Amino acid sequence: MYNFNKPIGSYGEHISENFLVSKGHKILTKNFRCRSGEIDIISSHNNYICFTEVKTRYNYSFGIPCESVTITKIKKIRNTAKFYIYINKLFKNNFKFNVIEIILNKYSNDYSINFIENAF
């Protein structure tokens, strides 16, 4: 059985990357991974390093996308961000943790974006 979650997530990350660039963000890295976890998009914007989690869905049958960013997921993102900050020596920077929710239209190429700055 084919798992559609990965291509849907990748498509959502692509949409999110374009959205952030259109808002003036400079993409530093995508899908940063370490033992602690993964961060979908890391960007810089207005003297902030922004760590962005992307959640993409076709509908709300499993709740709104940001509800899947649980306390456990937040801890993993924070620990991964700490590691990124450490290895890149970014100690003097300001930081933001954002969430982008994307709802795709199953029948067309339309989608809606909800950008939640300083989500946690």
UniProtKB/Swiss-Prot annotation:
One of its GO terms (molecular function) is nucleic acid binding. Belongs to the UPF0102 family. This is UPF0102 protein NT01CX_2205. Pfam families: UPF0102 (PF02021). InterPro entries: Restrct_endonuc-II-like, tRNA_endonuc-like_dom_sf, UPF0102_YraN-like. PANTHER family: UPF0102 PROTEIN YRAN (PTHR34039:SF1).
